[in-house]
């Protein structure tokens, strides 16, 4: 638990929603305390909070109280809010939704805090999205086996594998036919582990693998950010391979 009072804590605004006629409930991803829910009293109308509590805003937040909802007592800018539009905006909401769905409140993950900001600034780069997904699962204790196969042998870049989500990659003796399970090349696994650049044919393979892995923990409830992307994709400018709709 974070205690009764926390002062000037670096945090990102993930989400906001109305609470009473004048206040807001704000979901923050803080550096040292993890995901925090807080009530910003007067947040819907007061000039005090204007422009500070929008999603993707980096803030220095101060709050007090215990329990599920703290009381936000102050916030000030902590840098520029990334200028996201089109597919980059939809991808940003996808990142936020992953954190809201997968992180428990008051569960610190300081290693993810700077990675989140770096990923926002790289959107809509698909390799950045896959990297964030992979590091998020690792932080939660659900990391994928990427450097060794099921038999304990090192993964080889030119080899082909069938990935079993509960056990890891199974090396295949021959190039497999499409539709024979979750197929991936060793190069893609090494790229997700950070050993190679994630590009070219590895991108769709990584997308399929990460989508399957995340689905184990997201459950059956659809991601709202995918619906947002479908709306944005109706205009040609918004269409991009990095869309959350492809996850």
Swiss-Prot record:
Record carries keyword DNA repair: yes
Cited Pfam families: RecO_C, RecO_N
Stretches assigned to coiled coil: none
Keyword DNA repair: yes
GO biological process: DNA recombination; double-strand break repair
Entry keyword set: DNA damage, DNA recombination, DNA repair
Database matches in InterPro entries: DNA_rep/recomb_RecO_N, NA-bd_OB-fold, RecO, RecO_C
Superkingdom of the organism of origin: Bacteria
GO cellular component: bacterial nucleoid
Protein purpose: Involved in DNA repair and RecF pathway recombination.
Family in the record: Belongs to the RecO family.
Protein name: DNA repair protein RecO
Highest classification ranks of the organism: Bacteria, Pseudomonadati, Pseudomonadota, Gammaproteobacteria, Chromatiales
């Amino acid at each position: 638990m974070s205690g009764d009072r926390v002062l000037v804590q670096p945090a990102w605004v993930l989400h906001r929603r109305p609470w009473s006629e004048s206040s807001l409930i704000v979901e923050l991803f803080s550096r040292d305390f993890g995901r925090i829910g807080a009530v910003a009293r007067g947040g819907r109308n007061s000039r005090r909070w204007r422009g500070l509590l929008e999603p993707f805003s980096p803030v220095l937040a101060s709050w007090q109280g215990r329990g599920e909802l703290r009381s936000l007592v102050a916030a000030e800018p902590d840098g520029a809010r990334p200028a996201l539009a089109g597919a980059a905006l939809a991808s940003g909401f996808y990142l936020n939704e992953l954190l809201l769905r997968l992180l428990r409140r008051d569960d610190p993950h300081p290693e993810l805090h700077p990675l989140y900001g770096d990923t926002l600034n790289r959107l809509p780069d698909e390799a950045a999205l896959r990297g964030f997904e992979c590091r998020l699962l690792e932080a939660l204790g659900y990391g994928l086996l990427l450097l060794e196969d099921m038999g304990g042998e090192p993964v080889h870049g030119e080899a082909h594998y069938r990935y079993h989500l509960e056990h890891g990659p199974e090396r295949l003796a021959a190039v497999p036919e499409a539709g024979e399970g979750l197929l991936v090349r060793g190069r893609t696994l090494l790229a997700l582990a950070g050993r190679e650049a994630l590009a070219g044919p590895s991108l769709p393979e990584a997308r399929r693998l990460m989508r399957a892995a995340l689905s184990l923990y997201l459950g059956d409830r659809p991601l709202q950010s995918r619906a947002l992307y479908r709306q944005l994709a109706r205009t040609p400018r918004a269409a991009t391979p990095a869309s959350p709709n492809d996850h």
